[in-house]
Amino acid sequence: ELSPARGVSVRPRVPPEPLTIPDLHAQAVRGDERIVVAGMGPAGLFCALYLAEAGLRPLVVERGAAVDERLAAIESFNAGGALDTAANVQFGEGGAGTFSDGKLTTGTKSTHIRHVLEAFVQAGAPAEILWQAKPHIGTDKLPDVVKNIRERIISAGGEVRFLTRLADVEMASGQVRAVVLEDSRTGARETVP
C-alpha cells in the first residue's frame, strides 16, 4: 500500500451529482426582454455561462474593465500612475480575486463543485485542480481562464458589456420592468427592458 507523499493533500473522490443545463430556447424571454447578470466575478461568470448555455442570451454588465485593460491599468498604477477607478484590482472581469494568488476558496465538499472546476479546466486552468484538496489556478493563468469563459458566454449567445454599471432597477406591480445601466466613465444612462 502506498502512503501519501509528504506535503501533498489529496481530496477523496466524490462522484459529482449530475448537473443538467436545460435547453430553454422554447421558453426564451419575450421580445426585447433580457436576463441581466450584474458583475463578472465568479458568481456572475458562472450564472451567465449557464444561462447562455441554456439558450437565454444573458446580458452581462460589469462596472469595471476587461481583464487586459485591468492589467494595463494596474501596471500603470504600480509604476506611479493615477488610479483608474474603473479598471483596477477591485472591479472588472473576473472580480476582485483575479489578481490575487489564484487560489480557489471553494466548498470542495459540494458535489456540484466538480462542474465548476471542469469549466475552469476547459477554459485553460491546470487539470490538477480537479483533484487537489486546495485547488490553485495561479495568477499567471487566471486572466486567460476568465477571458476564455467570457468567450464561451458570447459564443453561446450572451452579451458582455464592460464599464457598465447597474444603476437602478425599475419595478412595477412587484415585478422588474427594466434596468438602468450607466457608463462607468461618462455617466451616460440606458434603460433596458
Residue locations for each model-derived region?
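Conserved N-terminal/central alpha/beta ligand/cofactor-binding core
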Residues: 69, 75-160, 164-165
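Core beta-strand elements of the Rossmann-like FAD/NAD(P) dinucleotide-binding domain
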Residues: 31, 185-193
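Extreme N-terminal leader/targeting segments of oxidoreductases
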Residues: 1-33
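Residues in the short beta-alpha loop(s) of Rossmann-like NAD(P)-binding domains
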Residues: 64
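Beta1/beta-strand and adjacent pyrophosphate-binding region of the FAD-binding site
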Residues: 28-43, 59-61
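A conserved short coil-to-beta-strand element within the FAD-binding core of flavoproteins
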Residues: 162-177
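Short beta-strand segments that buttress and anchor functional surface loops
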Residues: 179-183
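Aromatic pocket-lining residues of Rossmann-like dinucleotide-binding sites
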Residues: 50-51
